[in-house]
Amino acid sequence: MIYVHVPFCRSRCLYCGFFSQCSKGPGRAWADEVCAEAQARKDEIAASAAVDTLYFGGGTPSVLPLEFIGRIADACGGRHYREWTVEVNPDDITPEYAAGLRSLGVNRVSMGVQSLDDGMLRWMNRRHSAEGAKRAFLMLRDAGFDNISVDIIFGVNGMSREMLEGTVKEILQWRPEHISAYQLSIEEGSALGRMAREGRYLELSDEDCSAQYYLICSLLAAAGYEHYEISNWALPGCRAVHNSAYWTRAPYVGLGPGAHSLGGPFSPDAFASLIPPTSLRSWAPPVHAATGGHGLRAEGPAQANYRSWNSEDLSGWTSEGELLTEAQIREEQIMLGLRTAGGIPESLCHPADLSCHPERSVAESKDLLTPSALPGHLRIPEEHWFVADDIIAGLI
């Protein structure tokens, strides 16, 4: 399971606080550095291979020449993955680029649409138009992509219910296999953050954001999409494999400036509960030379327990890391697991946490957690997912 961070964008979105640089794209030296890092970490990559995914995120990976994408994939071990995703901006897609991605072996594309209102797109400093987004989607379809994810944003002050509903309904006409919806957040270091500090932008109320979120839930449910994670919906059989593995804390290798990694023991059982393990390679807990032997097996089910993060230096790979405590691992399991419809094992809840006992009455538990479809698991019901952060905070 490999993540490649591409910290380059042609322009910066109003709300973006991620590490990235505005440019026409990276030079060959950057690609050389990522390939060198992949080679240096080949043992880690082999140890995380059970999930069998490669994900190019950013930033804007579609600023990369096709040659760079292919070279980096080769350095990671090849071009054949159960799921190989590249994030794209609609403005970067041409018939030739879409066909080139497909010919490399990329089998999933995640496209940032955000809105189909041209005025809202201009306010966000997005480079594409509503019509351009639709054209890009059709180009990807024509290139043979049968697994496309589309991102949208809600909770924007100035985005009316009608505007959001129009965006969702139009995207449903395209019938993408996967849809992600994210609430606008004010990030430190973003242009929007500066506007908010100066009083030039006021956040939409929680009540209005909640109404928009549940409008999306209703529209996608009626269209046959499965709501399998707080921000993610999929047609049957089209859940995001890579992201689902994150939510079960599967080990992954993050390549490139600013990328994070998680290493250590891993039991595929938890992952298989979210994604059928039809393509999982046989796996045994590795000895991680790259973590100084910190990939230690915890008591009970094996859990990855070493987190590292790369520097943001574009000229070479350096990283730092920490061995996670049992308490930190448990917190991550709860925070990530309760974002999903599958929830978390009941064993993660302390007996003193009355809210964690499904047998208690609705009044006593305040409807915080209910049994999920997975035996012995508890989840936050969809009607409370908008306030999931508050519920999770009460459990950790």
Q: What does each model-found stretch correspond to?
A:
Residues 385-396:
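Short, amphipathic alpha-helical interaction segments positioned at domain boundaries
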Residues 367-374:
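A short, conserved structural fragment
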Residues 1, 20-44, 50-288, 292-350, ...:
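C-terminal scaffold of the Radical SAM
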